[in-house]
Amino acid sequence: MRNFFKTAVAITSLVMGLVAMAVVPARALVEIDVNRGVVEPVPIAITDFLSAGGRGAEISAVIAADLKRSGLFAPIDRGAFIEKISNPDVAPRFEDWKVINAQAIVTGRVTEEPGGRLKAEFRLWDTFAGQQLVGEQFFAKPADWRRVAHIIADTIYEQFTGEKGYFDSRIVFVDESGSKENRVKRLAIMDQDGANYRALTDGRSIVLKPSFSPQRQEITYVSFEGGQPQVYLLQIETGQRELVGNNFPTMSFASRFNPVGDKIIMSLLRTDGNSNIYTMDLKTRTTARLTDTNAIDTSPSYSPDGNKVVFTSDRGGRAQIYVMNADGSNPQRISFGDGTYSEPVWSPRGDLIAFTKQSGGQFQIGIMRTDGSGERILSTGFQIEGPTWSPNGRVIMFFRQDAGAAGPKLYSIDLTGRNEQLIPTPNFASDPAWSPLLN
C-alpha cells in the first residue's frame, strides 16, 4: 500500500511489503453472515481515538460512518458510554460496555511521529468474551488520515464477516452542474463516502460511462470531444488522455477493461446502425470482433476470471442479457423476464450479475445469478441506472433521478435491497464506477 504500512502489537510478519501484526485470541461471539437475507446490525462502541488535537475524533467518526452505512453495524451513541477511555492499551471495563449492549469496542490513539508522519493505533475488543480481537497500528502522511480510517473500518468489517471490506476505495463518476439546458458534465473522482472530491476533466466536452482499470490508475470513458462518442483512456494522477482506436470510422462506446487490464472491450457502431462488440489489445492496438449480428450488441462486462463476457443484445427482438465465451463463441440468452434489460455488470465475486431493467414504465436495478436464475429487483424508480459493484461484491452503487428532479444523484444499496443510502456529491452525479480496493 503506497505511503502506508502497518505494524504489530504482538507478532510480526512481512506480507506484500506491509509489516502486519494482530492479536486474535478468539472469534467474536457475534459473527455476521452476509449471505443471510436480513441481518440485524451489531451494536458496536467506537470511542474517540485519543489525540493531541481533534484528528482522533475525526478518524473515529469516519470509522463509525463507514460501518453504519454498511447496514451491518449499529454504532452506539457516545452519549451512552459509561467508561471514558483514557488508555487504549489497557482493556476496557467490559461490564460497563455490557450495560449498553455493546457487542464490541473500538479504542485507539493518534500521534504525530518525528518527521511529521501520522501514527494511528487501534484495538478491537470482544465485550462478552472479555478479549482483544485485533490490534494494529498504521503510519501515513497527515493528509491521508481518512484512508487510515477506511482501512481500520475494513479490518473491523473483515473480523466480523470473514470477508474483505470495501471502504478503502474510490468512485469515478460524471459530475453534472448547470441547468438542464446547459448541463456541464465532467469526470470526477472521490472516496467511496463522497470525501476528497476532485474533477478530472474540464467539462468542455460531454463525458459518459467511466470504468476503472484493475490497477486503479487508469480510467476508460466515453467523450463527445470530436462531435461523436469515442472511447478514451485517462491516467488519473497525470491527467494524460488518449483516444482509443483513432482510426475507428464510427462511434465507440460502453468500454471496460478486462480483469488483467491489458485489453478493453467495447461496442463499435456499424454504418448500418447496429453495433457489435470488439476488444482492443492495449499493447499492440489490434482489435478482435466478438459479435457479428444484425442487432445492437452493447454493454459488455467480463467475468472476474476473464473467461466469459456478459452483454445486452436485441437480436431476439428486444434488449436482453446474454453471456458468451471471452472469444465470442457460444452466446446464450440468460434473461427472460418482462421488459428490457441493459447495463449488465459481473460481480467481482463472480456469483451475480447486476443490471438495469425497464418494465411497467419504471426503471429497476436488479441482480441475477450468472445463468439468469434468481432474478431479484433491489430498487425501482422513475429513472435509476448505472449499477457498479463494490470491491467485495456486497454493495451496488447506481444513480437515481426522481420525477421532477433537476438532476440525478448517487445511491448505494446492499444485496438485501433494504439499505439504500444517498452518496453525497457537490453537484448532480451519474454513471458511477467503483474502484478495486486501494490497499
UniProtKB/Swiss-Prot annotation:
<keyword id="KW-0131">Cell cycle</keyword>
<dbReference type="Pfam" id="PF04052">
    <property type="entry name" value="TolB_N"/>
</dbReference>
<dbReference type="InterPro" id="IPR011042">
    <property type="entry name" value="6-blade_b-propeller_TolB-like"/>
</dbReference>
<dbReference type="InterPro" id="IPR007195">
    <property type="entry name" value="TolB_N"/>
</dbReference>
<comment type="subunit">
    <text>The Tol-Pal system is composed of five core proteins: the inner membrane proteins TolA, TolQ and TolR, the periplasmic protein TolB and the outer membrane protein Pal. They form a network linking the inner and outer membranes and the peptidoglycan layer.</text>
</comment>
<comment type="function">
    <text>Part of the Tol-Pal system, which plays a role in outer membrane invagination during cell division and is important for maintaining outer membrane integrity.</text>
</comment>
<keyword id="KW-0574">Periplasm</keyword>
<dbReference type="InterPro" id="IPR014167">
    <property type="entry name" value="Tol-Pal_TolB"/>
</dbReference>
<dbReference type="GO" id="GO:0051301">
    <property type="term" value="P:cell division"/>
</dbReference>
<keyword id="KW-0132">Cell division</keyword>
<dbReference type="Pfam" id="PF07676">
    <property type="entry name" value="PD40"/>
</dbReference>
<dbReference type="GO" id="GO:0017038">
    <property type="term" value="P:protein import"/>
</dbReference>
<dbReference type="InterPro" id="IPR011659">
    <property type="entry name" value="PD40"/>
</dbReference>
<feature type="signal peptide">
    <location>
        <begin position="1"/>
        <end position="22"/>
    </location>
</feature>
<comment type="similarity">
    <text>Belongs to the TolB family.</text>
</comment>
<protein>
    <recommendedName>
        <fullName>Tol-Pal system protein TolB</fullName>
    </recommendedName>
</protein>
<dbReference type="GO" id="GO:0042597">
    <property type="term" value="C:periplasmic space"/>
</dbReference>
<keyword id="KW-0732">Signal</keyword>
